[in-house]
Amino acid sequence: MKFKVRGIDTFASTGGRPFDKNKPLIIFVHGSGLSHMVWVLQTRYFAFRGYSVLAVDLPGHGLSSGESLKTIEEMGNWVGDVIGAVGCKEASLVGHSQGCLVTMECVAQHPEKIKTLTLMGGASAIPMNPELLRLAEESNPKAVDLMMDFAHGPAGHFGGHPVPGLYHLNVGSMIVQNKEIKDTLGVDFRACDNYKNGPEVAKKLDLPTLSILGAQDRMCRLKDGKILADYIKGSEVKIIEDCGHMMLLEEADQTLETVSYTHLRAHETQQ
């Protein structure tokens, strides 16, 4: 689905169903350098169960036009504008990695628009390894390889993708390298490295929140995810064992089950 946000063409996957602004809306926000493609299983599941879904491509990513936004604050404000751009008044948000910072900022800037929040592989701060940041800003493909290596747990390195013929590490690499690396991954990494407001923002959140953490996450470590959850009033925590940072791909079924039965229950009771 294509629509305009601030006059710029924006793409979002609707999970294979026509978008209906009268249904409860869930917006999925991808991580650094990625796109709507990482949410294929999640969007389809909810789209066929009574929800309207938008797995957005942030500006300059995937099939969205424009330049990549340079700060987490800008990205959060942009996600808030998406809600009105599609004719809705409120939404639930699901973010992964950098998308956690973005969705928290969206809640902070647009609290009246957000019903519930799901954070996958999140932390209150995501400082970047200087060498990885340098490689990404130089468009060196090694940055993508390193990110995918660190993002997956041990099991994710040995196959097991739910789609026959696909390999976990290659899926992310294909998405990132669809664009100039420095213009997406480089910009996103720099935005994460510069963002310092996470703890203060998290402490002010007051809405149903679920944190899904990978026990073997090497990018946003388990202990950092727990610290973030502790900052958020009433946050629920689900830990997925034998899983790294890319739980939405590595353990898609467990992740989906957790979101559907734990978190969106709160969404439904508020309707």
Model regions: which residues?
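Acidic catalytic loop of the alpha/beta-hydrolase fold
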Residues: 216-220
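Flexible "cap/lid" loop of the alpha/beta hydrolase fold
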Residues: 104-146
